[in-house]
């Protein structure tokens, strides 16, 4: 596909079994490059990345179940479900040799899709994947701090401008480049009849995702990802520390690591230039990367 003259993506829905999944097609020439967002976000947060990469790739971004303009079923929020959705999405669009980039939950969903059996991936970039190892939970942990906090999240604002002003000085948004905050706000809410705006990803769904996360061994999923993988972490991230990164590299059949100095879990929004450059170098490699000796 060729890029639209105005640079805006086209909006589409595709049926994946009993779900309607929404995605953005930014156009571009070259192999497909698909972006997957983190919990609570949406496809539009990748718009600055799409602008960068559509000179070399056909860029798409997916609203995962429960997010954005995709369906929001009351259940089905384990990592395995997100992985199965991704596999079926690629099948529905008949995309092959796909380069895929995921952040946080989106990164883990890529590994889960590989574990589900997809063979449509060419390369994968996992940015701050969510990785749990044993002992795993046998049931959702709804009293976890993340789940409880998400369940209490404010969902309604008088306007997008009021939402931006409220969120911009707070974590995690205070460390983001401003264009990413505006993408999150502008497209992360829907208009209500009373003139207010409401989150497209309800707090209850976000809470369900966090509650189910400790039920899956994310490190085991990595072992099924038999394509070249670039693992990106933020130096200040509490989730992907040295121990977790080393274990992830041990499990990945063909993985390399980049740690971005001074960045945290939201490194793609905090340090986009460094992340874009790293992704571009990785996607341009002619052969699978080799581990340093």
Regions inferred by a protein language model and the residue ranges of each:
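Conserved HGGG/HGGXW glycine-rich cap/lid loop of the alpha/beta-hydrolase fold
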Residues: 19-72
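Conserved hydrolase catalytic core segment
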Residues: 52, 96-139
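Helix-rich cap/lid subdomain of alpha/beta-hydrolase
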Residues: 134-197, 210
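Conserved serine/cysteine hydrolase catalytic core
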Residues: 179, 189-250, 259
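Catalytic histidine-centered segment of alpha/beta-hydrolase-like enzymes
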Residues: 260-272, 276
């Amino acid at each position: 596909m060729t890029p639209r003259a105005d640079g805006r993506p086209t909006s589409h829905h595709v049926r994946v079994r009993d779900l309607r999944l929404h995605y953005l097609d930014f156009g571009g020439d070259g192999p497909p490059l698909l972006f997957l967002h983190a919990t609570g976000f949406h496809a539009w947060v990748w718009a600055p990345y799409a602008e960068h990469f559509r000179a070399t790739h056909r860029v798409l971004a997916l609203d995962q179940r429960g997010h954005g303009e995709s369906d929001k079923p009351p259940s089905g929020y384990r990592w395995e479900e997100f992985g199965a959705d991704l596999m079926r999405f690629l099948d529905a669009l008949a995309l092959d040799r796909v380069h895929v980039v995921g952040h946080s939950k989106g990164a883990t969903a890529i590994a889960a899709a590989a574990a589900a059996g997809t063979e449509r991936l060419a390369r994968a970039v996992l940015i701050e994947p969510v990785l749990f190892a044993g002992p795993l939970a046998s049931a959702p942990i709804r009293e976890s701090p993340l789940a409880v906090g998400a369940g209490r999240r404010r969902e309604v604002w008088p306007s997008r401008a009021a939402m931006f002003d409220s969120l911009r000085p707070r974590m995690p948004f205070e460390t983001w480049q401003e264009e990413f905050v505006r993408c999150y706000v502008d497209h992360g809410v829907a208009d209500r009849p009373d003139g207010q705006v409401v989150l497209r990803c309800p707090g209850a769904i976000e809470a369900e995702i966090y509650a189910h996360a400790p039920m899956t061994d994310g490190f085991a999923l990595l072992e099924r990802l038999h394509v070249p993988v670039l693992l990106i972490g933020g130096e200040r991230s509490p989730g992907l520390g040295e121990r977790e990164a080393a274990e992830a590299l041990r499990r990945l059949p063909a993985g390399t690591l980049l740690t971005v100095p001074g960045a945290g879990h939201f490194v793609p929004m905090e340090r986009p230039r460094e992340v874009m450059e790293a992704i571009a170098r990785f996607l341009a490699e002619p052969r699978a990367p080799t581990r340093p000796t």
